[in-house]
Curated annotation (Swiss-Prot):
PROSITE patterns: BTB. It comes from Xenopus laevis (African clawed frog). Residues 33-100 form the BTB domain. The keyword Ligase does not apply. This is Kelch-like protein 30. The lineage of its organism: Eukaryota, Metazoa, Chordata, Craniata, Vertebrata.
Amino acid sequence: MVRNIDDLEFCLPSHSDAILSGLQTLRFNPRLSDVILVVQGREFPCHRAVLALCSQYFHAMFTGDFQESISAQVEIKEVDPEVMETLIDFSYTGRLTINQGNVEGLIRTSNLLSFPAVRKVCSRYLQQQMDATNCLGIWEFGETHGCPEVAAKALSFLQENFEAVSQEEEFLLLSPERMLCYLGDPLLQVRDEQSRAKAALHWVKQDKECRAQCLPQLLSVAQLSSLTDQYLQELMEVEPLISESEVCRTLIGKNLGQETRGLREQSPVFLQEVLVVVGGKVLEEEEEDEDEEDEETQRTSANFAYYNTKTKKWMAFPDFPDYNKWGFSITSLSNDVYVTGGSRGSRDDSWSTRQGWRFVLNEGIWKPITPMINPRTNHSSASLNGEIYVIGGTLQEAVEVECYDPYSGTWSLISPAQKYVSNFTAVGCSGKLYLIGSCAMKYNALTLQCYNPATDGWSVIASPFIPKYLSSPCCCTVGGSVYLIADNTKKVYMYLPEVNLWKKVQLLHTLHENGGMTSVGSCLYVTGGHWHGMARDYSVVMESYDCNTDVWTRQGPLPSPWLYHCTSTIFMDTSRWTEEFQGQPEAEL
């Protein structure tokens, strides 16, 4: 007998894969399979146990008191044999190829036969493929086939991109009922108040004979009362569909003159795009004998505001509850503002947080969201395809990325960027996530990386004329182009993804540190502080850039001397928030 030998725990890592692979091969041997699925005349030999593990439908069928539990053959009705074959192969291999041609069939069948893993990945695939050309069809599909998360994100995409969607073929194919529903949605985000009326006319002109009778009803929900008298008069004079319809003329006539009579305030709610800022640390005098009262005042100074680009005023929002932070990041999604990460320690002794907050615009309150998987400071965040991505800012030697699904309230890790960068910015543009940055080493050239959410894959883009080293870069998008600035130069760069080309635009008026850049309509808004003069005065200022005229315009100071802040944009009813923001005056050291 063998003595004095230690136990050995043996595990063959490839065993489970080998078993499944072997079962996939052996199932075609009639002696080694135990059931045959028959779909429209095609036969698929299988193992009951494998199907039951992957499908709740088959689990109930084979373990319940049904005839199918003992039958050698089971007929599956209302299922495409090609899709059935794909699902069976997935059950044995765990692999699945999803494309435009099979995704609808896979979702439909995985719902019917309860393959939750397949349904989930197909749902995400549809959400990541969404754009202006297909969001309406995806919305219809999600509604019809019991995918509420898909329908919700498609509707959100439509609301945020109505003007682009209204130019696509799917929009012109809408039924009158759907058209009326979409056009009357009070949450549509339109940058041009004429967009609803233009969309209604565009749709009717696709089939004048059949659709002209729908125009009065469509115009009745097109918020005509928010339009100028000049535009309404032009419609009456130059648009035959209106001038030749007594009902339309009457409808237009009722709204003429409201502008001069001051009745615009009684018009339906019109969502206006505004700039929002969340402030962190505020400039304070460096005095060692600062008393506790001053510290408490500093800690609770107002820190959340929006800028109305029409009135040129800063208005107050309810304070962000986590005062005096730095290193956090903000983005907006469905007109709610999300703040992630950051630190409240000093820059020499900082501690990052996993915290996330959401300002729910409709309720006017801040709510915590599910904490991130990793703590992050000095990271970037971006919204893309109805989800939020947070990039970098961890202590790892890799650019770790997480994705937040607001529908399920969950975070998930995605593939890290291919190349490590520590000095970076990120933005979503045309269905992709762009990461622009370099290592912290001085004069290290920038790298452009692109993430495709549909494939969960990153690529490094070799781009001609990419800018050299930039300190603390910051970017945003306007009209499908990416604009890039930094705090060490007044130069402004524009990247055109369609042609993979960089070019320079007009210089900034001043440098901006620890600020942000966002877009409102066709204009960029850049914020941030700078030191000036012999007295070392510190100013936090804003300037705007008109992308159509290539001109920068100074917009004055921010309402508080924040040493750190972030900006974004949302659409909102400005009549709801009318209190001017009371910040701190600019200070000097």
